[in-house]
Amino acid sequence: MSLIPMVVEQTGRGERAYDIFSRLLKDRIIFLGGAVDDQVANLIIAQMLFLESEDPEKEIFLYINSPGGVVTAGMAIYDTMQYVRCPVSTLCVGQAASMGAVLLAAGGEGKRFALPHARIMIHQPWGGFQGQATDINIHAQEILRLRETLNGVLASHTGQTLEKIATDTERDFFMGSEEAKKYGIVDDIVKRKV
């Protein structure tokens, strides 16, 4: 069981209690704080769509501390980030690994940040499947297709060549925030909120 802190606000009509994530959402902050799966993706997508309906011009802030997760769920978040009219700013707090790194890189131009001690990791998608040889082959082809898609997404957001991305993602490729900035995954490193 996870404990989610509550925040109490005083208003003219009395007190109002929010869970901390709902309170952050009022400030247009969405927090990805774990593995990416379908449930997490659906919640993040719903929050983005809600914030867009509230004000399509106002920035959305996606804070990321994630080890990555399911590629299709992550791509649903990615596609929504590109779909909404709101500019989306990304900030890595802790780690952005695998699909988390793809989402970090997908923030708006000039709006991708990392904290000083953040860790970023990119790699190729992995998966396991058992069954008949033909089914295993079908799934292997799908993983290769996903790898090409993810490499293309990273190349388009970082400015790196597809060849460099393919080479670097052959194995786990870890970066600190400075290295991620040089690589083009983030635009800047922030030490203090302004």
Curated annotation (Swiss-Prot):
Main location: cytoplasm
InterPro entries named among the record's database cross-references: ClpP, ClpP/crotonase-like_dom_sf, ClpP/TepA, ClpP_His_AS, ClpP_Ser_AS
Catalytic activity, as annotated: Hydrolysis of proteins to small peptides in the presence of ATP and magnesium. alpha-casein is the usual test substrate. In the absence of ATP, only oligopeptides shorter than five residues are hydrolyzed (such as succinyl-Leu-Tyr-|-NHMec, and Leu-Tyr-Leu-|-Tyr-Trp, in which cleavage of the -Tyr-|-Leu- and -Tyr-|-Trp bonds also occurs)
GO annotation, cellular component aspect: cytoplasm; endopeptidase Clp complex
Gene3D superfamilies: 2-enoyl-CoA Hydratase, Chain A, domain 1
Subunit structure: Fourteen ClpP subunits assemble into 2 heptameric rings which stack back to back to give a disk-like structure with a central cavity, resembling the structure of eukaryotic proteasomes.
Name by which UniProt lists this protein: ATP-dependent Clp protease proteolytic subunit
Source organism of this protein record: Syntrophotalea carbinolica (strain DSM 2380 / NBRC 103641 / GraBd1)
